[in-house]
Amino acid sequence: QADVGLALGTLYGNVFSQTTICRFEALQLSFKNMCKLKPLLNKWLEEADSSTGSPTSIDKIAAQGRKRKKRTSIEVSVKGALESHFLKCPKPAAQEITTLADSLQ
């Protein structure tokens, strides 16, 4: 399902999540969203069926896999400062967060 969503995005410009494809299969999307997704899926299926046996753009997309976001890493000293601040004040205001961020840079 994730690969289908990625393939749709690469081929037609609309990336759909695995959840959206799953909900489409289970008929749990709104009528409007079903109408938007059905023509794209039909087109993708026709292309996939017509290209059996020969490598195509769909095969290339599947080989690429889903791009993953880079994992965020926080320095130990910064993590300690954040944890101690949020223990003192679990719900800081926006200005406090900005001040804290500036002090940690």
Swiss-Prot record:
PANTHER family: POU DOMAIN, POU DOMAIN, CLASS 3, TRANSCRIPTION FACTOR 3. Keywords: Activator, DNA-binding, Homeobox, Nucleus, Transcription, Transcription regulation. The keyword DNA-binding applies. Residues 67-105 bind DNA. Residues 1-49 form the POU-specific domain. GO terms for molecular function: DNA-binding transcription factor activity, RNA polymerase II-specific; RNA polymerase II cis-regulatory region sequence-specific DNA binding. It comes from the Eukaryota. It is found in: Nucleus. Its main location: nucleus. SMART domains: POU. One of its GO terms (cellular component) is nucleus. This is POU domain, class 3, transcription factor 3. Belongs to the POU transcription factor family. Class-3 subfamily.
